[in-house]
Amino acid sequence: MRSGLAATLEGRASPPDQQVFGQVCRPVGERAKAVAAERGWQVLQMAARNRNAAHALDAEGARVSRMFEADAGLTAVWLRSSMNGTPGMRYFRRITVEASCLACHGARDARPAFVVTKYPDDRAFDFKPGDLRGLYAVFVPDSLAGKE
């Protein structure tokens, strides 16, 4: 979903604005939240170089992020985990920077105005295609494992 929506940015004459963000990036987050609510899972987007501090890596995410950094071919990791005392499985999926991502995550000085204004503490820039942008983290409680 993310790749398909981001591809709509390619070849644009004007820089992305808040409206484009709402059509390209926001739907991915909204879909993740909907799936999480529907199934009782926790779904997060996390990154070391985040735009929003709420998306900072936790200790487990930092460990998995280092694994992804060390092995560009590694796309996913499952771990036994617990959240707030609840045992379960945690699935991590890498987010790899694509050329279309550079419209907002490329050179610091080339970021769209809405990004600079909305995210004054932004650290999600100066990426290149193929870089690790971050990861999706999905926690599935044992009590829900195998249930659809």
Predicted regions and their residues:
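Extracytoplasmic c-type cytochrome modules immediately beyond a signal peptide or single-pass transmembrane anchor
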Residues: M1-E98, A110-E148
